């Protein structure tokens, strides 16, 4: 029985069977890499050519032009601004400039007077002490004649005396309403007057004598005004009567007006040697101290402020 079998291909092809071989490829690596790169470039070009519809639009940026360089001003001299100029002035220079402006423009001077705070007792006495230090610094060393010394210290001496004359009315009523402030200033100013130079010549002593006279009248005015407030009780409780008696003794009795004002109001220190006449007149029933209705006796007896009887009962 003849059976026809289909011929089966051999698992190992013959080397001469060229029809079944794969196409021949280039063995050059350079050619292979070039073809691959070209394909990649073609794919990228296709992707970039197709823009998605949902892609956001890139905003266009405006490039700012570089600003022109500002040309620096050439160096030249110019005066200082007013705030810088005032920083360079000390107290004396600033006071001099302000004083000249006020003298040239009286309306500005009046505004300064109205706007400036009132001087305190401490500031006024501090200025007097500054003038006093200048006077001491002008006194020559060693033994010198009286005339030479006087003319050497005349200018600071006059400046101190004038300062006392200018400051004293500022602390007197009705400008100064506080009696204690007035008394404190007069106490300090009197101490300054005590230390003024003593001269042998009467012509040179007139400055100190005039200063004592002015201070004495100022004491009298303040004492009289204080006696109208509470019977002048502040004069005794503050020890001002004894203080005035010591000043009068140190001045050589040149505060007579002040002592008379203190005695006439019934307030004077009992330990002072300058009140012996006043004490004697009080014990004899004469003067203000001997009056039973005086404020001093009423305060001592405890009857000050009691109601006064009116009528026959």
UniProtKB/Swiss-Prot annotation:
Keyword field contains Aminoacyl-tRNA synthetase: no
Q: Which UniProt keywords apply?
A: Cytoplasm, Nucleus, Protein transport, Transport
Mark out the compositionally biased spans (Low complexity): 269-285
Q: Which example biological process does GO assign this protein?
A: proteasome-mediated ubiquitin-dependent protein catabolic process
Q: Where is this region: Disordered?
A: 1-76, 264-301
Q: Name one GO cellular component term.
A: cytoplasm
A Gene Ontology molecular-function term? protein-membrane adaptor activity
User: Ranges of Polar residues compositional bias?
Assistant: 16-34
Task: Report the superkingdom from the record.
Answer: Eukaryota
Compartments (UniProt record): Cytoplasm; Nucleus
Tell me the subunit arrangement. Binds the proteasome.
Role played: Involved in ubiquitin-mediated protein degradation. Regulatory factor in the ubiquitin/proteasome pathway that controls the turnover of proteasome substrates. Targets proteasomes to the nucleus and facilitates the degradation of nuclear proteins.
- Family that this chain belongs to: Belongs to the cut8/STS1 family.
Q: What is this protein called?
A: Tethering factor for nuclear proteasome STS1
């Amino acid at each position: 029985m003849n059976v026809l079998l289909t011929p089966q291909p051999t698992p190992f092809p013959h080397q001469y069977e060229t029809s079944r071989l794969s196409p021949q490829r280039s063995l050059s690596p350079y050619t292979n890499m070039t073809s691959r790169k070209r394909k990649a470039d073609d794919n990228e070009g296709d992707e970039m050519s197709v823009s998605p519809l949902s892609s956001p639009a890139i905003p266009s940026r405006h490039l700012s032009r570089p600003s022109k360089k500002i040309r620096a001003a050439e160096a030249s001299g110019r005066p200082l601004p007013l705030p810088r100029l005032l920083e360079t002035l000390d107290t004396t220079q600033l006071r001099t400039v302000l004083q000249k402006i006020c003298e040239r423009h009286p309306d500005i001077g009046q505004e300064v007077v109205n706007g400036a705070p009132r001087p305190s007792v401490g500031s006024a006495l501090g200025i007097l002490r500054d003038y006093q230090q200048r006077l001491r610094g002008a006194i020559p060393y060693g033994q010198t004649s009286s005339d030479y010394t006087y003319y050497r210290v005349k200018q600071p001496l006059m400046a101190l005396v004038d300062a006392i004359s200018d400051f004293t009315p500022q602390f007197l009523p009705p400008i100064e309403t506080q009696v204690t402030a007035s008394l404190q200033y007069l106490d300090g100013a009197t101490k300054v007057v005590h230390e003024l130079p003593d001269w042998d010549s009467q012509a040179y002593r007139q400055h100190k004598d005039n200063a004592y006279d002015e201070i004495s009248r100022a004491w009298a005015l303040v004492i009289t005004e204080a006696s109208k407030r509470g019977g002048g009780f502040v004069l005794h409780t503050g020890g001002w009567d004894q203080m005035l008696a010591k000043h009068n003794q140190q001045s050589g009795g040149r505060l007579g007006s002040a002592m008379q004002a203190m005695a006439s109001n019934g307030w004077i220190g009992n330990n002072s040697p300058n009140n012996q006449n006043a004490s004697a007149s009080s014990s004899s029933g004469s003067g203000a101290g001997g009056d039973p209705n005086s404020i001093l006796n009423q305060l001592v007896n405890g009857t000050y402020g009691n109601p006064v009887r009116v009528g026959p009962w």
